[in-house]
């Protein structure tokens, strides 16, 4: 009886609650919202850059996926940030993140032995460049039934290619004295059909760069890139890159046409870069350092992204500014102000170190709009862009608050 009473009372209350209504009076329009208030916000999260907007088709191209988070140390399956006071709570942080070194090393890569005898390992030896210290070493005792041992990259959920399109290939190889063969680069469909290939001769023992334009004979969103070695011996592979020839506005190291055009069609007044929490970083050393995103992408060290993967920084500061110019949007640059993400380690720099951060902001402004008579404006001009970029806004920090921020 008590239950029946409460149910009846509840139903009565439900009936008595007035239903909300929304009235729109078209005769009294409010103030017009300026177009300058509508923009878009880029952040390297959920592979929105690497694997989407940025046109690179090869994942883990420099074999650096396993490199520890800057400012952290590895111990027993975790990377640990240094204990330091959190800039909001003042309590010592104990931030850590799980880290499977061996799994991360081989992200997107595998070795097809084809019934041969071979092994592979990510190593730190015979460095190609300080920014890409690791490479893939392949030790071949005997080639298999196909006559090759194949290093395969599966891209970001596949290497998508279209019939008749061209793709810019770039990779580096060095060999041991024993290795007398060559290397064949292939784009292979998900049902093992060769869609494009090019054979190269490895002529010296030091690092050798190989480039080619591959034209595909078929369409497959799940294709792979394969580097096929045809003799016994040891070879090292580093920085493997495959780009569609047709990028947005045909920019080198550019953006996917389809994704970039969707953003352009929004007609944003501004673009915010490089993002939100990644600006701060999990630690202060893990923050985005815009100067490390310039130049040849092979020389960009990249960084672990606190959204749990390593980013190439291929869509760097220059590419961001160029994209803004290409779609007639103003640029909003978000800069670190000496604070890491409050919800990760939350460490911060001493006030005496702030001049370094202030100078970094000034240098970023100079790179974008300097007249070329100053250091960073001159670097922009050397990079092939003589006119200033449309940088209009500089945002100091991301979602920061509290006494130390102010």
Residue spans for each PLM region:
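Active-site neighborhood of glycoside hydrolase catalytic domains
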Residues: 356-363, 367-378, 382-406
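Short linear capping/connector segments at secondary-structure termini
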Residues: 338-339, 346, 380-382
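Bacterial Sec-dependent N-terminal signal peptides
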Residues: 1-20
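A structural signal for well-ordered alpha-helical segments within the folded catalytic domains
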Residues: 315-318, 322, 358-362
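Solvent-exposed loop/turn segments at secondary-structure junctions
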Residues: 46-47, 276-280, 337-341, 398-403
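A structural motif corresponding to the C-terminal end of an alpha-helix
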Residues: 319-330, 387
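Extracellular and organelle-lumenal recognition/adhesion modules and their flexible linkers in secreted
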Residues: 19-312, 330, 345-355, 362
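Hydrophobic beta-strand scaffold residues
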Residues: 331-335
């Amino acid at each position: 009886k008590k239950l029946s009473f409460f149910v009846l009372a509840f139903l009565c209350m439900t009936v008595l609650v007035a239903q909300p209504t929304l009235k729109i009076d078209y005769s009294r329009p409010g103030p017009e919202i300026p177009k300058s208030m509508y923009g878009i916000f880029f952040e390297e999260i959920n592979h929105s850059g690497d694997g989407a907007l940025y046109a690179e088709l090869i994942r883990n191209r420099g074999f650096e996926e396993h490199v520890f988070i800057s400012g952290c140390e590895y111990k027993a399956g975790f990377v640990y940030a240094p204990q330091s006071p959190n800039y909001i709570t003042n309590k010592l942080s104990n931030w850590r993140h799980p880290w499977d070194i061996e799994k991360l090393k081989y992200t997107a890569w595998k070795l097809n032995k084809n019934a041969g005898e071979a092994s592979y390992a990510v190593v730190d030896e015979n460095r190609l460049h300080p920014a890409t210290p690791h490479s893939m070493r392949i030790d071949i005792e005997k080639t298999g039934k196909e006559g090759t041992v194949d290093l395969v990259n599966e891209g970001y959920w596949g290497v998508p290619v279209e019939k008749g399109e061209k793709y810019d290939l770039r990779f580096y190889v060095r060999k041991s004295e024993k290795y007398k063969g060559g290397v064949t680069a292939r784009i292979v469909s998900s049902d093992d059909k060769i869609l494009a290939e090019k054979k190269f001769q490895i002529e010296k023992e030091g690092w050798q760069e190989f480039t080619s334009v591959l034209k595909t004979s078929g369409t497959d969103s799940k294709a792979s890139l394969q580097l096929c070695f045809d003799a016994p011996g040891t070879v090292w592979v580093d920085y493997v890159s495959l780009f569609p020839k047709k990028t947005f506005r045909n920019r080198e190291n550019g953006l996917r046409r389809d994704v970039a055009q969707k953003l352009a069609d929004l007609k944003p007044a501004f673009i915010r870069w490089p993002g939100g929490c990644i600006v701060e970083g999990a630690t202060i050393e893990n923050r985005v350092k815009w100067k490390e995103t310039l130049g040849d992408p092979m020389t960009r060290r990249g960084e672990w992204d606190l959204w749990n993967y390593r980013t190439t920084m291929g869509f760097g500061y220059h590419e961001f500014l160029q994209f803004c110019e290409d779609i007639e949007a103003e640029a909003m640059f978000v800069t670190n102000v000496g604070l890491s993400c409050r919800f990760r380690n939350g460490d911060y720099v001493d006030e005496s170190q702030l001049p370094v951060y202030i100078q970094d902001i000034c240098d970023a402004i100079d790179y974008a709009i300097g007249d070329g008579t100053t250091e960073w404006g001159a670097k922009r001009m050397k990079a092939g862009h003589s006119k200033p970029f449309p940088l209009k806004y500089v945002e100091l920090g991301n979602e920061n608050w509290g006494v130390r921020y102010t």
